[in-house]
Amino acid sequence: MAGSPDQEGFFNLLTHVQGDRMEEQRCSLQAGPGQNPESQGGPAPEMDNLMDMLVNTQGRRMDDQRVTVNSLPGFQPIGPKDGMQKRPGTLSPQPLLTPQDPAALSFRRNSSPQPQTQAP
């Protein structure tokens, strides 16, 4: 849909004015005296150590909050006697579960009473 020449002129003027406003708001960043952007390396080693400590602490907190589930509806434990196996490199166990027979699950889902229809 093409606009009238007046509309085109208005939008061209608007674009020009808005573009000038954007240019006026731009600023250039310059390194201060004695600061060479190329000489600045990555994060300080102290910051790396802090971040590593934070990641490890949060990971341990998440492991502490994990719940061991002995049985879930529709699943049966397999594997070791208690149904648990330690994951390598962690302190928390990982449950080993296998789904039950799908027919048994569908039977349980459909076991609610069904409305009975009466024959005429």
UniProtKB/Swiss-Prot annotation:
PROSITE patterns: GOLOCO
Molecular functions per Gene Ontology: guanyl-nucleotide exchange factor activity
Tissue-by-tissue expression: Cerebellum (Purkinje cells) and retinal bipolar neurons.
Family matches, as Pfam families: GoLoco
Signal peptide: none
Keywords: Phosphoprotein, Repeat
Stated name of the protein: Purkinje cell protein 2
Protein source organism: Mus musculus
